[in-house]
Curated annotation (Swiss-Prot):
The chain crosses the membrane at residues 1-21. F-type ATPases have 2 components, F(1) - the catalytic core - and F(0) - the membrane proton channel. F(1) has five subunits: alpha(3), beta(3), gamma(1), delta(1), epsilon(1). F(0) has three main subunits: a(1), b(2) and c(10-14). The alpha and beta chains form an alternating ring which encloses part of the gamma chain. F(1) is attached to F(0) by a central stalk formed by the gamma and epsilon chains, while a peripheral stalk is formed by the delta and b chains. It is a single-pass membrane protein. Its main location: membrane. It comes from Brucella anthropi (strain ATCC 49188 / DSM 6882 / CCUG 24695 / JCM 21032 / LMG 3331 / NBRC 15819 / NCTC 12168 / Alc 37). Keywords: ATP synthesis, Cell inner membrane, Cell membrane, CF(0), Hydrogen ion transport, Ion transport, Membrane, Transmembrane, Transmembrane helix, Transport. This is ATP synthase subunit b 2. CDD domains: ATP-synt_Fo_b (cd06503).
């Protein structure tokens, strides 16, 4: 009997003790439990992955909606700015037209006033010149007669 025989006997006894203590069943149950745990973890990971994909799709959808809404807001703001610009341009043009018309009216009034002033000055000068000429040429007797005639005309016009 050599050492190999005793090693074989020891191995058989060891395996018998393991079989008696039901170690292979415990190892099998442990492996089955671990396999079930891994299976559950894989199922949970698949569920979490699906949820993550749904959340990602929802995020992308919301992002696209937000981009569309932002585009709509920008387009609306551009339309409003264009309308405000057109209103401001129209109001400015109307203001300039009113100011031009007012300036033209003032110029026309000033022209009329200037013409009237020139006419009045011309009349005053003519009256003064005529008065001087008449005063130089008319004697006292003729002046008295002219005064009486003018007085009678004024009286007849007043009555």
């Amino acid at each position: 009997m050599d050492a190999t025989f005793w090693a074989l006997i020891g191995l058989i006894i060891f395996l018998a003790i393991l079989a008696y203590l039901k170690v292979p069943g415990m190892v099998g149950r442990s492996l089955d439990e671990r396999a079930d745990r891994i299976k559950n973890e894989l199922e949970e990971a698949r569920t979490l992955r699906e949820e993550a994909q749904q959340l990602l799709a929802e995020y992308h959808r919301k992002r696209k909606e937000a981009e569309k809404e932002a585009g709509d807001i920008v387009a609306s703001a551009e339309r409003e700015a264009k309308a405000l610009l057109e209103d401001a341009k129209r109001a400015t043009e109307e203001y300039v037209a009113r100011r031009n018309k007012l300036a033209e009216q003032k110029i026309a009034t000033a022209e009329v006033d200037a013409i009237n002033a020139v006419r009045a000055s011309a009349v005053d000068l003519a009256v003064a010149a005529a008065g001087k000429i008449v005063a130089d040429k008319v004697d006292t007797k003729v002046a008295g007669n002219l005064f009486k005639d003018a007085l009678s005309q004024v009286k007849s016009n007043l009555n």
